């Protein structure tokens, strides 16, 4: 059983186990120990978002890595995909991201990329856990003259901006586009405005004044209403909202209507199919994606494959089976042609390129898919419980699944990052699926509160 790592690295309240300085230093030691294979200077990239606790955790990880004789390259606040890019660009042995993504500023986390820019597999995370908890590394520390050094890459942001612009077709510019962006006071604040402005767009930027405590606070991908309202107010062409670490994108059309990740995937999949760039004509989504996406893919002549929730599992499925595009309803979009992980800014550029090429608004492009009614409810639990242990729960789910038939489905799963059980119900009748979700949530609450 995992003791440190969840579905997306290690995460928790800063300065509380497991997100303590002591654990962070041990994680740094473990990563350094695992990458040391040959007799040469090894290097690990470290980047972060804009949380107050990022500096504390960064220093602890740096100390751990250097104490094992490995050098550190610091890039400062940079989106998660930017850190993956710099890791591969600098031929580093690994990359470390200090971020809790869309969570409030009190939380923080540690995510790790391998030298190829992909997140560590489960087996490698378990090795790190074992090393951290066993204390075996204390006997393996090098002599004083062999400790590592930490240095800063001053132009990391600029390198990433150039990379992003190169993913946008060179025959197009964004001249004539008015774009509203919301950077959530997070890692994209110093990157996104420059990318879109340098490509010729008029940019209205929100969420670009981080103070260490305002990341994701009433803004960004979790609060697209801020971006949408500004689009309507200014008559902009599109709105783009990123989460705290920049690996997620939520968009709104020219009317201020939010377009979720499923619709964006459908838009991009259609274009990739038309260009014959969709490997095996397959889109990889997750179990959370709407049934309407499945229907849309069939109409386009493509296929939908579902992976477990989490962009890392989407990427694992893509790599294992040779697929090129995938994502999540929540806004993680992965274009393996360009990037090894979800990248909000890169995804936005691909959408804008389609709008430019097809000479259509986002609202027109979004007609490619019609969503089935879907309700998603979160039940916060006082203690960790398994739905399998709830008496009568499995029978209730089976009964409702029979009631919905082939035009609906039920998904119940625990969150990988917080004490929450998510209940998703999909079907043709909104009132019916809402009632079903309420009944299932009530069963969970009774056990949680008992």
From Swiss-Prot:
How is the co-factor bound, per the entry? Binds 1 Mg(2+) ion per subunit.
| Chain positions recorded as Mg(2+) binding sites | 101, 243, 245, 247
**Which GO cellular component terms, listed alphabetically, does the Swiss-Prot or TrEMBL entry include?**
cytosol
Q: What is the lineage of its organism?
A: Bacteria, Pseudomonadati, Thermodesulfobacteriota, Desulfobulbia, Desulfobulbales
Q: What is this protein called?
A: Phosphoglucosamine mutase
Phosphoserine modified-residue sites: 101
Q: Name one GO molecular function term.
A: phosphoglucosamine mutase activity
Q: Which domain of life is it from?
A: Bacteria
EC number annotated for this UniProt entry: 5.4.2.10
Among InterPro entries, the record links this protein to: A-D-PHexomutase_a/b/a-I (IPR005844), A-D-PHexomutase_a/b/a-I/II/III (IPR016055), A-D-PHexomutase_a/b/a-II (IPR005845), A-D-PHexomutase_a/b/a-III (IPR005846), A-D-PHexomutase_C (IPR005843), A-D-PHexomutase_C_sf (IPR036900), A-D-PHexomutase_CS (IPR016066), Alpha-D-phosphohexomutase_SF (IPR005841)
């Amino acid at each position: 059983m995992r003791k440190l790592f969840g579905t997306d690295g290690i995460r928790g309240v800063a300065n509380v186990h497991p997100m303590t300085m002591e654990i962070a230093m041990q994680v740094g030691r473990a990563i350094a120990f695992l990458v040391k294979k040959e007799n040469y200077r090894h290097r690990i990239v470290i980047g972060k978002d804009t949380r107050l606790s990022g500096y504390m955790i960064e220093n602890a990880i740096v100390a751990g890595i250097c104490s094992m004789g490995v050098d550190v390259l610091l890039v400062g606040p940079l989106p998660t995909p930017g850190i993956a890019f710099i890791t591969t660009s600098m031929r580093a042995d690994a990359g470390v991201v200090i971020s809790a993504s869309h969570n409030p500023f009190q939380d923080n986390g540690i995510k790790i990329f391998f030298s190829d820019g992909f997140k560590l597999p489960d087996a490698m995370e378990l090795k790190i856990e074992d090393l951290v908890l066993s204390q075996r590394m204390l006997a393996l520390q090098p002599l004083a003259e062999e400790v590592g050094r930490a240095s800063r890459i001053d132009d990391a942001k600029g390198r990433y901006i150039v990379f992003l612009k190169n993913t946008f077709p060179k025959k197009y510019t964004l001249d004539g586009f008015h774009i509203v962006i919301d950077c959530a006071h997070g890692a994209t604040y110093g990157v996104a405005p420059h990318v879109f402005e340098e490509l010729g767009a008029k940019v209205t930027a929100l969420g670009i004044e981080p103070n260490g405590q305002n990341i994701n606070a009433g803004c960004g991908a979790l609060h697209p209403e801020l971006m949408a309202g500004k689009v309507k107010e200014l008559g902009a062409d599109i709105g783009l909202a990123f989460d705290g670490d920049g690996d997620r994108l939520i968009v709104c059309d020219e009317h201020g209507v939010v377009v979720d990740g499923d619709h964006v995937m459908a838009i991009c999949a259609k274009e990739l199919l038309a260009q014959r760039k969709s490997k095996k004509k397959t889109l990889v989504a997750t179990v959370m994606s709407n049934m309407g996406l499945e229907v849309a893919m069939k109409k386009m002549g493509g296929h939908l494959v579902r992976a477990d929730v989490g962009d890392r599992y989407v990427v694992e499925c893509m790599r294992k089976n040779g697929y090129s595009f995938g994502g999540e309803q929540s806004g993680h979009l992965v274009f393996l042609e360009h990037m090894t992980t979800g990248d909000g800014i890169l995804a936005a550029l691909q959408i804008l390129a389609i709008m430019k090429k097809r000479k259509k608004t986002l609202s027109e492009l979004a007609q490619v898919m019609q969503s089935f009614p879907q309700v998603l409810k979160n039940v916060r639990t006082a203690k960790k419980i398994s739905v399998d242990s709830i008496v009568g729960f499995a029978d209730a789910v089976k009964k409702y699944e029979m009631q919905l038939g082939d035009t609906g489905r039920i998904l119940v799963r625990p969150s990988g990052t917080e004490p929450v059980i998510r209940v998703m119900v999909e079907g043709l009748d909104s009132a019916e699926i809402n009632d079903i979700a309420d009944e299932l949530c009530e069963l969970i609450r009774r056990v949680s509160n008992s």
